[in-house]
């Protein structure tokens, strides 16, 4: 890959897998502990002369390492091909020598690692080329069959954690393979930079039919299933094997099928019923079972996923088509209205509305807040009524956000909610600008048309906000490249943010329950009022995300600063003996089980959002061979359920620890950890709140653990030693005083305004110490002078005495 081309996300993931594989090859050793990789890494001759067809291929592991560093591999099969040809040349070089057996052993190790990577889901199904065959040295480079090439060569996904990777089935629809071949690959087989930019994942701006929405829900649930160890079972079924490297598969299977083929057929609307979609899934699993040995892991996974698919279908069969847009799909158009006559424009109040125009749709829930929308399609129904398919843009008060969130004035958020409205529901025009243009000017000729600013998307499923990176990707295809004239400001304006418009919904103790309200079937599923969530703490991220399945309490709702409780005063509390733990725990339980303020949760928005964000129906749990798990209903007393907030106050209590030999039921692949298949998820099935041992016991607040015989020095009022209690402050009733904070007024220093001096004792000590030092120094000097004088006398006497 050219250094000027920025590697894609798939190329980076592939590079990590290749590095991991290459490290295992370099670490391979023989029985004596000697590394085997130098045999193929330090070839002493040009191995390209041995195999003429290997011109341009790496001749050492170092050259393969260089190709990995430069992102020249777009598919794992290319790496396998180069590594296989490297072994062909090295074996030809050492043929007839003792080294040949070591090279062959290293090749077998690579084949074994290839199978391990496939079983772990890192790579698709790839076979090692037959390097012993003479035709192996003359075969062409590996490439996919155009009939099944639904993705470019670098489109392979190496799914170790499918949740981290994106779900391509919920985004851009796939193009024809021949179109991709022309647009994505040049003559040299490398990708152009502009094509790589176009491959960047962007949400689809096309509304989905009810069949597509239902199919994608089923596809996602089956695809994301994981066993107890976290392994993704669906990884081998993502793509078809390479026909050049695995021709026997296509000889044995008459109708090859994989997820890539199903996705292509679904995006091209080849399925007329959901049964046809399910038949292809069953065909894919049946092919895997017929081709693989019954004892293989792929066979067991295919059999399990087929049964799991049947249970998912039973769970989804009872749902209406209108339910699927709420939590699994990004868009929806009304399927019950046939769109027979597609029109380029429609006239309303003497003006023409075209695709891409911004309009305000009547909002039956709040007529003062019409729905900001953009037209994606104009059509006429069978009863000769003009309709428009629009994409909704929600206002801040129509979203679920934290109480400390701030927004721009006139800000709206793009959603993936698509609706069909009669033209008669359009109440006027509007205009939405991206923030980079909004601060620079206004569109020309809009007059009094309201203008809104947009910077982020809003996910109605996860209640998350995310910044928009490409405004053109948010536009309909008909107007994605068009521009409009602007009247620029003298200088860019500075936008200010305002507080949440829902702060007035914060409940008070005197506020009663609001009366329920009904809305129109085609109105805002999130109408005039949004919902407030707890403000983010310092340790939390800046995201507005929240899980609707997390229960909220009155302690979690944000409180304005003016009404926040005052800090505790420095008042003593008495260390009195409490009656029993049950009274304290019941009081705490009553406090923690307070109901959520009804103004935030009983509004129409919360009734709808609670339904739409409820957890997906529980996936059935299966006990697979080799990974059986005991479904024990016993819960450890110290286990915390993931649905409870970590900020809850847990009352003190005595603990009786009991050993449990059973394991908890559930699987990582099972959403709710159901005890039996088809068990629905319910809040009541959650374990009770845990009780922890206290880090320390405040004296006087607990009973003695042993009531049989009092311990000497311990009275019935406190649990501290009486000798220690005598040293503590007490009131007139001889009750020990316990302060909540340290004292504010320490003992003042004497002579605060005077100069600080040493004490008399210290001064006398320094004087005596100094005089002692002086005396010792004088004595040392006197001895030194005497020694010098004696030396001088001795030298003079020696000089005067004749020899």
Swiss-Prot record:
User: Where in the sequence does UniProt note compositional bias of the Basic and acidic residues kind?
Assistant: 178-197
Spell out the SUPFAM superfamilies in the cross-references.
Bromodomain
Bias (Polar residues) occurs at 128-154, 512-525, 540-553, 605-615
Localization terms from the record: Nucleus
Looking up Pfam families in the UniProt record yields: BAH, Bromodomain
Q: GO CC terms on record?
A: chromatin; nucleus; RSC-type complex
Say where the protein is mainly found.
nucleus
- Indicate the segments annotated as coiled coil, or none if absent: none
> What's the subunit arrangement here?
Component of the RSC complex composed of at least arp9, arp42, rsc1, rsc4, rsc7, rsc9, rsc58, sfh1, snf21, ssr1, ssr2, ssr3 and ssr4. The complex interacts with histone and histone variant components of centromeric chromatin.
Protein name per UniProt:
Chromatin structure-remodeling complex subunit rsc1
The gene it comes from is rsc1
């Amino acid at each position: 890959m050219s250094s000027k081309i920025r590697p894609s996300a798939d190329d980076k993931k592939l590079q990590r897998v290749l590095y991991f594989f290459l490290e295992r090859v370099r670490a391979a050793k023989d029985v004596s502990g000697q590394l085997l990789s130098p045999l193929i890494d330090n070839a002493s001759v040009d191995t390209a002369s041995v195999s003429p067809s290997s011109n341009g291929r790496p001749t050492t592991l170092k050259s393969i390492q260089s190709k990995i560093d430069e992102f020249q591999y777009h598919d794992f099969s290319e790496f396998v091909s180069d590594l296989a040809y490297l072994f062909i040349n090295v074996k030809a070089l050492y043929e007839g020598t003792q080294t040949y057996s070591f090279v062959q052993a290293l090749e077998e190790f690579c084949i074994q690692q290839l199978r391990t990577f496939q079983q772990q889901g890192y790579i698709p199904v790839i076979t090692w080329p037959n390097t012993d065959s003479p035709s192996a040295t003359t075969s062409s480079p590996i490439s996919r069959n155009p009939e099944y090439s639904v993705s470019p060569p670098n489109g392979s996904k190496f799914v170790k954690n499918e949740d981290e990777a994106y779900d391509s089935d919920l985004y851009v629809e796939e193009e024809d393979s021949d179109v991709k071949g022309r647009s994505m690959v040049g003559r040299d087989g490398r990708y152009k930079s502009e094509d790589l930019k176009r491959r960047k994942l962007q949400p689809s701006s096309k509304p989905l039919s009810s069949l597509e929405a239902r199919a994608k829900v089923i596809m996602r649930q089956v695809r994301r299933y994981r066993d107890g160890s976290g392994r993704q079972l669906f990884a081998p079924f993502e793509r078809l094997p390479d026909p050049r490297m695995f021709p026997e598969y296509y000889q044995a299977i008459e109708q090859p099928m994989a997820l890539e083929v199903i996705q292509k057929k679904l995006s091209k609307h080849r399925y007329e019923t959901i049964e046809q979609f399910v038949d292809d899934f069953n065909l894919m699993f049946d092919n895997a079972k017929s081709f693989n040995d019954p004892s293989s892991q792929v066979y067991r996974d295919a059999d399990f996923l087929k049964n799991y698919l049947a249970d998912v279908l039973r769970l989804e069969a009872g749902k209406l088509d209108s339910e699927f847009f709420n939590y699994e799909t990004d868009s929806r158009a009304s399927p019950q209205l046939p769109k027979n006559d597609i029109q380029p424009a429609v006239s309303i109040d003497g003006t023409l509305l075209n695709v891409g125009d911004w309009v305000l749709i009547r909002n039956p829930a709040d007529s003062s807040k019409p729905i900001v929308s953009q037209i994606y399609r104009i059509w006429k129904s069978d009863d000769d009524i003009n309709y428009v398919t629009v994409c909704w843009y929600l206002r801040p008060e129509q979203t679920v956000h934290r109480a400390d969130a701030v927004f721009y004035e006139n800000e709206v958020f793009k959603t993936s909610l698509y609706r069909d409205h009669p033209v008669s529901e359009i109440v006027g025009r509007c205009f939405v600008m991206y923030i980079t243009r909004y601060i620079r000017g206004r569109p020309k000729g809009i007059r009094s048309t309201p203008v809104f600013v947009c910077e982020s998307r809003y996910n109605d499923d996860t209640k998350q906000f995310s910044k928009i990176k490409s405004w053109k990707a948010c536009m309909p295809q008909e107007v994605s490249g068009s521009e409009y004239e602007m009247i620029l400001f003298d200088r860019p304006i500075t936008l200010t943010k305002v507080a949440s418009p829902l702060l007035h919904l914060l409940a008070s103790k005197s506020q009663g329950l609001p009366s329920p309200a009904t809305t129109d079937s085609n109105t805002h599923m999130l109408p005039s009022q949004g919902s407030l969530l707890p403000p983010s703490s310092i340790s939390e991220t800046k995201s507005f995300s929240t899980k609707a399945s997390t229960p909220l309490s009155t302690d979690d709702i944000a409180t304005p600063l003016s009404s926040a409780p005052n800090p505790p005063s420095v008042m003593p509390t008495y260390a009195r003996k409490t009656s029993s733990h049950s009274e304290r725990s019941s009081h705490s339980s009553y406090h923690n089980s307070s109901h959520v303020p009804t103004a935030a949760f009983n509004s129409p928005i919360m009734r709808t959002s609670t339904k739409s964000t409820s957890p997906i129906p529980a996936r059935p749990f299966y006990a697979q061979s080799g990974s059986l798990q005991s479904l024990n209903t016993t819960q450890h007393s110290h286990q915390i359920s993931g649905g409870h907030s970590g900020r809850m106050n847990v009352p003190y209590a005595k603990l009786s620890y009991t050993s449990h030999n059973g394991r908890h039921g559930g699987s990582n692949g099972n959403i709710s950890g159901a005890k039996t298949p088809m068990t629905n998820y319910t809040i009541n099935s959650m374990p009770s709140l845990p009780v922890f041992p206290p880090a320390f016991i405040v004296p006087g607040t607990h009973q003695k653990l042993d009531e049989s015989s009092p311990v000497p020095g311990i009275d019935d009022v406190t649990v501290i030693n009486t000798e220690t209690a005598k040293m503590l402050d007490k009131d007139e009733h001889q009750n020990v005083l316990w302060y909540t904070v340290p004292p504010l007024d320490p003992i003042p220093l004497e002579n605060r305004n005077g100069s600080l001096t040493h004490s008399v004792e210290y001064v006398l000590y320094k004087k005596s110490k100094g005089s002692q030092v002086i005396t010792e120094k004088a004595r040392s000097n006197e001895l030194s002078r005497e020694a010098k004088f004696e030396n001088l006398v001795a030298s003079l006497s020696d000089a005067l005495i004749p020899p």
